[in-house]
Structures are given as structure tokens and as C-alpha cells.
A protein has these predicted regions:
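Periplasmic c-type cytochrome electron-transfer domains
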Residues: 7-144
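Sec-dependent bacterial lipoprotein signal peptides
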Residues: 1-5
Length: 144
């Protein structure tokens, strides 16, 4: 993903996939990962940091965790999850449980990959109302 590539440091060494980072419950298949975005410790840590970081919203007030609450199975209990500047949302934030197994994203199935789906709330005017180029610049300057 261009977004994550722009956030990386050039001095970092190559990342190695870490297949045992996740414990797959009995009866579940292996989690599919794109060849160009395999799970690594660094990507896991970056994803967790970004999930809780309000820098992804244009006014710095919302993070993914604002609506995908851990105490609610990473879902929201509101019919329409609110966006930045108290803008009314247009959809409910669904649970993220087992999201890596989903064949498509958003209720209508309009987004084919998880890597593409993460861009939707960031750019949606009623959610984070931000743009990827600005976020990439801010994150590249971040010390983490």
C-alpha cells in the first residue's frame, strides 16, 4: 500500500513475515494475507498504533477505536457512528471480529480488500474527512 510505504523509514531493514504472530483457533483456516502485505511484527505494531491514533481524522478528534470499541467486540452501539465535527454518520461501525476472513467490505460489498477498506473512513467526509497524502506526510514526520 502506498499509504503505509510512505510512512516507513528508509533506514529500516527488510521485514520478515511472522506466521506465528496470530494464534488460529481450532477449526479456522489460515488467515489469508496478500503477498505484498504479509503480517510482520512491525506492521502489527503500526496497525495497532494507527487504530488508536486520532491523527487519521482531519480535526484530530477521532480514531478507528472511537467507533470500533474493544468493549463492544470492536463495534459501535450507535445506529449511525458519528464523524468529525459532530457530523452525522451514514452507517454503523460493524464488528471487526474475524474481519480478515471477509470476502468483501462495507455492507454493500463495494470494497474488495481490507487494504482498500481502511481508506474509506479516512476519506469519507462524514467520518474522518481527511486525505491520504496529508496523512502520509504527517506520519512520515512522526517519530514512531
Amino acid at each position: 500500500m502506498l499509504f503505509l510505504y510512505a510512512c516507513s523509514r528508509e533506514t529500516e531493514g527488510p521485514e520478515k513475515p511472522v506466521p506465528d504472530l496470530l494464534t488460529i483457533p481450532p477449526g479456522f483456516p489460515e488467515m489469508p494475507f496478500p503477498k505484498d502485505n504479509e503480517l510482520t511484527v512491525q506492521r502489527w505494531q503500526l496497525g495497532k498504533k494507527l487504530f488508536y491514533d486520532p491523527v487519521l481524522s482531519v480535526d484530530g478528534t477521532l480514531s478507528c477505536a472511537s467507533c470500533h470499541q474493544a468493549s463492544l467486540a470492536f463495534a459501535d452501539d450507535k445506529a449511525f457512528s458519528p464523524g468529525v465535527m459532530s457530523r452525522p454518520g451514514v452507517r454503523n461501525a460493524p464488528s471487526l471480529a474475524n474481519v480478515g476472513y471477509h470476502p468483501y467490505y462495507l455492507r454493500e460489498g463495494s470494497v474488495p480488500t481490507l487494504e482498500m477498506q481502511v481508506l474509506v473512513p479516512i476519506q469519507e467526509q462524514n467520518e474522518f474527512a481527511h486525505d491520504i497524502l496529508t496523512i502520509a506526510k504527517v506520519l512520515k514526520e512522526d517519530s514512531v
